[in-house]
């Protein structure tokens, strides 16, 4: 019996050590609030996984179809039209582009597609940003914006994505 208890104690101790030695993945969240008179809102979580960042969440209240989705340079959504968020996050001074273009703004995520009920499920991976405040690609303290219209993935500097339907600070 003592031997069984000893083995169980060692097993629990090893399990506890393994659990505490695992490094947690950096995460951040943006809570999107309506802007420009829209009803668009939602929550997006950012999770750093190695060199990529996974965006996951749900956004509601938009019209059906694709809508521009970008990280903006300033973490300020105070303006009623979210113009206080500045332009697209662009630390490397690239041209506007699509999410898979080799040269683009770091904040060019592409389009979200909203269904008939006005809901978009977010499940995107991005490779040119980091969930941190440090370094040129850090996104904490910046803004996440959903636009009124589709991003054409080419027109500089905005992709003709229209007004800003929702904005949230990444933190």
Regions found by a protein language model. Give the residues of each.
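Positively charged n-region of N-terminal signal peptides that target proteins for export
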Residues: 1-4
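Bacterial N-terminal signal peptides
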Residues: 6-15
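N-terminal leader/targeting pre-sequences
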Residues: 15-66, 71-171
